[in-house]
Amino acid sequence: MNQTLLSSFGTPFERVENALAALREGRGVMVLDDEDRENEGDMIFPAETMTIEQMALTIRHGSGIVCLCITEDRRKQLDLPMMVENNTSAYGTGFTVTIEAAEGVTTGVSAADRITTVRAAIADGAKPSDLNRPGHVFPLRAQAGGVLTRGGHTEATIDLMTLAGFKPAGVLCELTNDDGTMARAPECIEFANKHNMALVTIEDLVAYRQAHERKAS
């Protein structure tokens, strides 16, 4: 990732710390992956605190595929089958079947309905019967080990939520341009500045975790 583009957001470690602070303050974070991977920026929010307004922003400026990143333990708790048995997608993204809250929603499409679905899925005592399948929220199962195992937005979201002190569950959606094309780093940086979002790269998060885990050992 071009560090000159990112310099206004601080050093790699500062970017991670700023992202964690933003999440704790209820703000969103823009997460960029490598230019030779997906080369995309995802808007992420804590599943526990994301507001209807933030969901509306995400739907309006994103791909429309609003994803809920969860752990394997949560997937099992909710009895969510993986979307396919043989995942042949380019990066092995861990989609499960889609979901809708069983109660408290209308069509499930609105920002408010999607927030209701997210909250139902991450509730402490959530049961499989609390969710209907299919629906308009796309759960993503993160790999154990986070970004140190797989350098994806799904794992980055879970790692950031955990480091910020939230449940390991977060909402993500890819940022798109007004013409429907995918936003690349310059557009993601502009959007993050405009909407008071912190910005961090998956590479930053890998380095941050490696450094902290070396200290711990």
From Swiss-Prot:
Transmembrane segments: none annotated. Homodimer. Its cofactor is Mg(2+); Mn(2+). This is 3,4-dihydroxy-2-butanone 4-phosphate synthase. GO terms for biological process: riboflavin biosynthetic process. GO terms for cellular component: cytosol. Catalyzes the conversion of D-ribulose 5-phosphate to formate and 3,4-dihydroxy-2-butanone 4-phosphate. It comes from the Bacteria. It is an enzyme of class 4 (lyase). It comes from Escherichia fergusonii (strain ATCC 35469 / DSM 13698 / CCUG 18766 / IAM 14443 / JCM 21226 / LMG 7866 / NBRC 102419 / NCTC 12128 / CDC 0568-73). Its EC number is 4.1.99.12. GO terms for molecular function: 3,4-dihydroxy-2-butanone-4-phosphate synthase activity; magnesium ion binding; manganese ion binding. Mg(2+) 1 binds at residue 38. Pathway: Cofactor biosynthesis; riboflavin biosynthesis; 2-hydroxy-3-oxobutyl phosphate from D-ribulose 5-phosphate: step 1/1.
